[in-house]
Amino acid sequence: MTELKNDRYLRALLRQPVDVTPVWMMRQAGRYLPEYKATRAQAGDFMSLCKNAELACEVTLQPLRRYPLDAAILFSDILTIPDAMGLGLYFEAGEGPRFTAPVTCKADVEKLPIPDPEGELGYVMNAVRTIRRELKGEVPLIGFSGSPWTLATYMVEGGSSKAFTVIKKMMYADPQALHLLLDKLAKSVTLYLNAQIKAGAQSVMIFDTWGGVLTGRDYQQFSLYYMHKIVDGLLRENDGRCVPVTLFTKGGGQWLEAMAETGCDALGLDWTTDIADARRRVGHKVALQGNMDPSMLYAPPARIEDEVATILAGFGQGEGHVFNLGHGIHQDVPPEHAGAFVEAVHRLSAQYHN
């Protein structure tokens, strides 16, 4: 494989010295970029874009042509696994993702296959291989998956949800069925991420978007337990290099200590967590990624710079920080504001590394 020219993102995840704080943005390949909209129109629809390796590669690389980002992230969707299980994923205008055949009971769970990463999900691996080739070693490639709990919420609710009553009903009335589903998903995610690593992903991230809707006890049992199983089963070295793992539970700032016990290398923080407090609590054990409010990118560049300075000062001197937003970039953010953000992180962070 090509020698990596910029490895500061991987070094920061392993709490090794870097010259400046690395930065990337969740959803950095997305609708705020006019070139993304043009490529998506060419593909026809979102899943066609995901399933075409050349176009998925093109949109992955688009933000890197605009900004000096320190990592690329695979362009895909967290719902690829449930789609490959046969739930019939489709996208409703203004409604987000929906499934034609949601999971309603234990019998439904028992029928679900564990998808073959090089079979039904082979298009994802083709995209990973294509992106790695086209990156030419400029920056590392991040692979990812949704967490078992987060995938289960979509599968049981039949799509996006605000109250999560359907899956919580299953959790409290038929926990055995939910545990069976989560166990299948944990096995599927482990296979899926390991296949991404073998195909060329140099770091992986598990997105637990909806873990924060659970009580502390339920989070441990129904979300964290299964993420821990995945971390235990992941390839942690490939191509002679360590493959770092990041866990991100949105709304999970109160559980950082338990998350750090999983053996992951880094924790993603949303914008509601104080990064100085997070570093005091778990910085001796894991790197931290985050955590500017994505809405700050609507502000004038000078205000964005102030916020970057505040977060850098909050983390303080030394290693183990990857700068990011606290969640995905919004689709109507001016692209030049994202550029001001990336530039400010690199310029203002040098003083914290010596």
From Swiss-Prot:
Matches recorded under Pfam families: URO-D
Cellular component GO terms held in the UniProt record: cytosol
Lyase keyword on record: yes
Reactions it catalyzes: uroporphyrinogen III + 4 H(+) = coproporphyrinogen III + 4 CO2
CDD domains reported in the protein's UniProt record: URO-D
Principal location: cytoplasm
Sorted UniProt keywords: Cytoplasm, Decarboxylase, Lyase, Porphyrin biosynthesis
EC id: 4.1.1.37
Keyword Membrane part of the UniProt annotation: no
Molecular-function GO terms, alphabetical: uroporphyrinogen decarboxylase activity
Pathway of action: Porphyrin-containing compound metabolism; protoporphyrin-IX biosynthesis; coproporphyrinogen-III from 5-aminolevulinate: step 4/4
Localization per Swiss-Prot or TrEMBL: Cytoplasm
Site (Transition state stabilizer): 77
Binding site for substrate: 27-31, 77, 154, 209, 327
Gene Ontology BP terms: protoporphyrinogen IX biosynthetic process from glutamate
Family: Belongs to the uroporphyrinogen decarboxylase family.
PANTHER family xref list: METHYLTETRAHYDROFOLATE:HOMOCYSTEINE METHYLTRANSFERASE RELATED (PTHR21091), UROPORPHYRINOGEN DECARBOXYLASE (PTHR21091:SF169)
Record's subunit section: Homodimer.
Summary of the function given for this chain in its UniProt record: Catalyzes the decarboxylation of four acetate groups of uroporphyrinogen-III to yield coproporphyrinogen-III.
UniProt protein name: Uroporphyrinogen decarboxylase
Species of the source: Salmonella dublin (strain CT_02021853)
